[in-house]
Amino acid sequence: AAQIEHLLTLPAKSPVVVAVDNSPVADRALYARLAEGGVDVIANHNRGGIAGAFNAGVEFLIGRGCDVFFIFDQDSHVPDDYFDRMLSGCARVGDSRFLVGPRIFNRNFQRDLPLFTVRRWSARITPIHGGAHGLLSCSVIISSGTAISLDAYRALGRFREDFFIDHVDAEYCMRAQAHGVPVRVNADVSLPHELGSPSAQQHWPRVEIFDQSALREIFSVKRLVLS
């Protein structure tokens, strides 16, 4: 219920809001309530998984004349000034093609998600320190809160629906890197998020372990290998 109430606050912050429902059965009463509050709804019925939902939402927004698209999870809580501050950051990228995400504050570990940078033969994880500001270059950002420009979507194409669950966002970011599309974190904007469930065991200092279901882990490993 709280998620629905928050969703209904978004039309006051953004000119076009669409919710993509991946539930197997459409809730017509809920759809009518959202429509009355200014939220368009797409009943996707889990076609293509989360990637299919992303594609359906982005293509709906393209049809409405939008040139920047923001993606959120159902539990994302969007601050009042989020869109203005993120668009200000997007304007500083220096390229009409971009993927720009916020600084993600992981509630499960009470700290910011680090920057992930991948090169041909190496990878690096860099903490985001409290005093960081502006746009930070990286290779991978998570989908929640990310701004994608129309020019970037046209250059990169649709999200891969065969990935279905995990690494949909990572694959898209790696595709962006291969095509020279800038991937940035806007350190001036923070978005709280929960990433998996923290393990009760600490195997190594400051290594974050996410506990997930066995099925989710199988999908994750398969998609990571395919990446």
Mark where each language-model region is.
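Short beta-strand-to-loop acidic/aromatic patch adjacent to the donor-nucleotide binding site
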Residues: 66-77
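A recurrent flexible, glycine/aromatic-enriched loop bordering the glycosyltransferase active site
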Residues: 128-148
